[in-house]
C-alpha cells in the first residue's frame, strides 16, 4: 500500500440523485501485498464471494441488489462455477475467520458475464451478480460510486485496492484473515504495455502499482475494487483482473477499466441504477510521453464504446457433491507469458 498523494479533481453527477446520495460514502473511513489491516467499515462496499463457505473472489456493492466483480471468477460458464445456487455473497464482513458482527449474507439470483470476455487476453474481465433480495444500507454496508464513461485517471492517480488475497505469492493472510487495504498509483496504459509486453494491455484495462514493487493486489483479491477519492466520494476505477506474480518490480497489476462499461452495466440494471461519477484528473497525463519498441504513437483522441448486448449465464441443475475448485485468484495473463518467454 502507498502513502497518500491526493490529486485535485472535479466531478459531475450523471445519474439520478438517489444513489448518488449514498454511493462512495464511507463514514468510518479515516483516511494486499505490502498492505495493512483495514479498520471495520472503512470500505463498506467490499464483499466476499463464497462457494461452499469458502472465499473465492472479492467484489463491490454498486446498489441495493447488484455486485460488480471479475468474469474470471467464473471460469466455465456452463458448469459448476456459474451455478448461482452454490454462491453466497458476504457483505459487511471484516474477517474471513472469526467474529463478523456487522455481516449479512445473501444468495445469488443471477450471474451475468460480459459477452465479450476473453479468457486468453483477459479483455472485458467483468461480471455482475444480482442478489436474492435488496440489502439495507448501514455504516458497514454501502455502495461505491462507479467511474462514468470518459473518466480520466492520469498516471500517478492515487488509488486504493482492498481484498482478502494472499499477502505474498503463495502466503495466506494470518488468522483471523482481516480485510487488507493497499495504496497504489495508477500506471498509464502506454507505460504498462511497455512493461507487460506491447499488446497485453487494452483500452478496457487500467494498471496500478509501484514500479519498485512491494505493493499490489494478489491471488484471492480477484474481482475486488480499486477506488480513488474525489472530494468526500470514493469512485471505483478498476476491478482486480490479472498480473504476473504479485508486487514484482516493473510489473504493475492490471484491472478492468470500469468507466468503459457504463452502458453494459446500466443495460442490466433497469431501476435503482448505480451512481456513476465523472472522474477527471487535472493537468497533462505523463503517460502520453511513454514509448518503447512496437508501441504506436498516442492517438489525438481515444473513445471506447462497449457492446450493448447481454449474456445471461445458464443456471444448470447439478447433484455433484465433489468438484474441483476453479482458480478463484487474480489470474496471470497468457499474453504476458507469450510476450516474455517466446519473444
Residue positions per predicted region:
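A short, Trp-centered hydrophobic/proline-enriched beta-strand micro-motif
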Residues: 39-51, 90
Amino acid at each position: 500500500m502507498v502513502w497518500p498523494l491526493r490529486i485535485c479533481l472535479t466531478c459531475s453527477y450523471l445519474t439520478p440523485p438517489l444513489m448518488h446520495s449514498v454511493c462512495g460514502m464511507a463514514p468510518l473511513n479515516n483516511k494486499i501485498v505490502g498492505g495493512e489491516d483495514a479498520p471495520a467499515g472503512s470500505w463498506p462496499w467490499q464483499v466476499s464471494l463464497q462457494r461452499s463457505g469458502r472465499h473465492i473472489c472479492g467484489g463491490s456493492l454498486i446498489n441495493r441488489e447488484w455486485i460488480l466483480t471479475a468474469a474470471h471468477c467464473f471460469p466455465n460458464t456452463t458448469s459448476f462455477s456459474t451455478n448461482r445456487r452454490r454462491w453466497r455473497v458476504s457483505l459487511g464482513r471484516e474477517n474471513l475467520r472469526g467474529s463478523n458482527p456487522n455481516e449479512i449474507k445473501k444468495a445469488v439470483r443471477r450471474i451475468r458475464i460480459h459477452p465479450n470476455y476473453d479468457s486468453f487476453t483477459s479483455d472485458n474481465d467483468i461480471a455482475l451478480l444480482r442478489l436474492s433480495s435488496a440489502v439495507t444500507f448501514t455504516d458497514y454496508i454501502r455502495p461505491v460510486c462507479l467511474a462514468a464513461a470518459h473518466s480520466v485517471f492520469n498516471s500517478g492517480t492515487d488509488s486504493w485496492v482492498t481484498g482478502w488475497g494472499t499477502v505474498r505469492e503463495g502466503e495466506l493472510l494470518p488468522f483471523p484473515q482481516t480485510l487488507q487495504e493497499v495504496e497504489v498509483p495508477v500506471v498509464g496504459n502506454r507505460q504498462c504495455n511497455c512493461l507487460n509486453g506491447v499488446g497485453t494491455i487494452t483500452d478496457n484495462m487500467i494498471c496500478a502499482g509501484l514500479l519498485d514493487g512491494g505493493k499490489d493486489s494478489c491471488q484471492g483479491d480477484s474481482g475486488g475494487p480499486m477506488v480513488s477519492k474525489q472530494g468526500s466520494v470514493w469512485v471505483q476505477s478498476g476491478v482486480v483482473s490479472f498480473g504476473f506474480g504479485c508486487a514484482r518490480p516493473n510489473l504493475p497489476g492490471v484491472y478492468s477499466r470500469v468507466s468503459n462499461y457504463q452502458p453494459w452495466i446500466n443495460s442490466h440494471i433497469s431501476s435503482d441504477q448505480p451512481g456513476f461519477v465523472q472522474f477527471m484528473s487535472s493537468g497533462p497525463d505523463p503517460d502520453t510521453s511513454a514509448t518503447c519498441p512496437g508501441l504506436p504513437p498516442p492517438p489525438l483522441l481515444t473513445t471506447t464504446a462497449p457492446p450493448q448486448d447481454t449474456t445471461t449465464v445458464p443456471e444448470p441443475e447439478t447433484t455433484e457433491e465433489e468438484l474441483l475448485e476453479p482458480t478463484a485468484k487474480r489470474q496471470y495473463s497468457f499474453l504476458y507469458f507469450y510476450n516474455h518467454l517466446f519473444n
